[in-house]
A protein has these predicted regions:
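Trp/Gly-enriched beta-strand/coil motifs that build multi-repeat beta-propeller-like domains
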Residues: 1-55
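Short, surface-exposed charged micro-motifs
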Residues: 8-10, 69-71, 127-129
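Short acidic-glycine loop/turn motifs at beta-strand connectors
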Residues: 14-15, 83-85, 132-133
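Short, surface-exposed beta-strand-loop junctions and turns on beta-sheet-rich folds
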Residues: 17, 24-28, 85-90, 146-147, ...
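Conserved hydrophobic/aromatic positions in well-ordered beta-strands
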Residues: 19, 80-82, 128
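Intrinsically disordered, low-complexity
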Residues: 44-110, 114, 186-191
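Exported/periplasmic cell-wall-interacting domains
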Residues: 54-65, 101-103, 112-191
Length: 191
């Protein structure tokens, strides 16, 4: 796919690796898997990134629990909503932090439709808390808005490490996770 200015290209390999040339901007590595090969590739309308559509949802990580649960893979930058029968109700690209939370099994202990972080007036919606960091709870929520009213990252940047600890989702996907879970729902964190 050529950039709008005609001086760069995005190139996607059969395995989904994205290569950039010239003026094409690279916003993180996204790779396909044999269970979810690349089906389509498109440059965003603002020419600041790209989207890859896979032909199937990626499979669940090995050793990721049983029963109804949320699975968060930090290395894959992905969350799955898994039903009791093992079917997948949703899977979303996310942004977390490389070193937390630690791989383990947790339970959701609190949910808030709207919340403000304890510093810098950072606002979040659809907060679903499942563990604790050094000073604050860690959970799933939408892309936060800072004290100046600006989004702290773009949707195109989901799929890369951007957070100070929580797991960020697109607004509609954060709402879906919020509505799908309840206090006590299992959360399995894997690498």
């Amino acid at each position: 796919e050529q950039t709008f200015d005609g001086t760069g290209y995005w190139l996607v390999s059969q395995r989904g690796k994205v290569f950039t040339f010239g003026s094409a901007i690279h916003f993180g590595q996204m790779t396909a898997h044999e269970l979810a090969p690349v089906g389509a590739f498109a440059v965003s309308n603002s020419n600041d990134g790209y989207w890859m559509m896979t032909t199937g949802a990626p499979g669940l990580p090995a050793d990721s629990g049983e029963g109804r649960r949320v699975i968060f893979s930090n290395q894959r930058h992905r969350v799955w909503l898994v039903e009791d029968d093992g079917s997948i109700s949703g899977n979303f690209f996310v942004s977390g932090r490389a070193d937390q939370p630690k791989p383990d099994t947790y339970r959701i202990f609190s949910k808030s439709r709207h919340t403000i972080a304890g510093h810098d007036d950072i606002r979040m919606e659809y907060m679903v808390r499942f563990t604790w960091g050094v000073e604050q709870a860690i959970g799933f929520h939408n892309i936060p808005i800072d004290g100046f009213g600006e989004a702290m990252q773009s949707e195109a940047q989901l799929g890369s490490y951007r957070s100070e600890g929580c797991v960020r989702l697109r607004d509609d996907q954060a709402a879906a996770l919020f509505n799908w879970t309840k206090v006590g729902t299992q959360v399995v964190v894997v690498d």
